[in-house]
Amino acid sequence: MTITRRGFLSASAVLAAMPVLRASAAPLPREADIAVIGAGAAGIAAARRIMATGRKVIVVEAAPQIGGRCITDSTTFDTPFDRGARWMHNPDTNPMIRLARSAGLDVLPAPSGQKMRIGRRNARAGETEQFLAALVRANRAIDEAARAKLDSSCASVLPKDLGDWAGAAEFMLGAGFAGKDLKELSAIDKGRAQDRNAAIACRQGLGTLITKLGEQAPMALSTPASRIAWSNRDVSVETQAGKIAARAVIVTVSTNVLISGAIKFTPDIPKRTLDAASKLGLGSYDRIMLQLPGNPLGLSRDDILIEQSNSTRTALMFANIGGSSLCSIDVGGAFGRDLSEQGEKAMASFAREWIAKLFGSEAASAVQKTSATRWNASPFVMGAMSAASPGGQLSRRVLAEPIGNVFFAGEATHETLWGTVDGAWESGERAADAALRKIGALKDDPADVPTQSTKKRRAPRQ
């Protein structure tokens, strides 16, 4: 049976309304039409797309839970928090918003803007304006380099006269945006990233949403794929639980996992693909979670705070999450990577030190329970979001190219929504469509339906 895209979209609507079933712990199936490696946003999107056509799919996930880099922690503190991806974007076109509501979850606008701390005081209005002006100038310089197709580092094209605001601007555009310092980030990649100002939050957690959306999919958790044998006709996926024969496979693992060799390919995948993945290495971005009862910092619900800094040893705070006493200190880039390597104790010490610097030792002493993510040490992810190195922006398109009956998905394959769960989701749907076409299960209607990234183009900054 071949289904048209229009018929598929109707089936997708039915699938979204189906009762949610928990991922099966049944024995691993020995065959499927399409196997999906990874149960993050891209893998779940691909699986749902395939299920809507009535084709047989199996999702193979190395970790013991659904989510990938979207994990909501509901047990460490009284308040749930996202250990990884936190926001969605593009509310007018993002299908995940509708799916969240259909799943009974609450979506709401994320906090906009941030407060600036200068030493132990809040920035004055004029100082905030100066910072925003510096940020706009820095961003504009990167955009101009991108439009001129100068794929050098973002740092190399920055204005030289940002003064006291250079450190904060570089943090917000580099480590705080992509998990990499600007000297390690491609100007074209940064310039092509769609604006992400209209952020949307899921009150129950983005990880909770991905888990709910994946509960219908046939799932093998705690089952790392060790080898993929592929050709132009079929594939086989080897795991510790057995081998799966399929007509196609969609690989959604992170670029760092792909180049690590954790999954062997027979025959080897082309050097061109691995080179592309290596130029899209994951940045470092972690959260240090602190319980601060009594609001000793005097901040409001969901306040976002940064500091005027002349050093990369800095952070971003997301305070009083959801009106609770839980605060997140986010660190990234080279400093964040080095700090994470030192372990959770060192990360908590830095968070207390940072709070003491900005609010005083009494505020820092109010910290009670702490916890920290260490995504670089996660064996099934090995980092945060992909970020192209200088000269590497074209690698996203290369990485998305199918190889025989092997298809790749994940945020790293999206040219404008990279580093976002939205980009991961859309890439999974695209890869599923391509795989379904390859096996003859999907035929496009003459008038194709645009995706969220083609419905609304990014307007150039003025």
Task: For the regions a language model picked out, list residue spans one by one.
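Secretory targeting signals
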Residues: 1-3
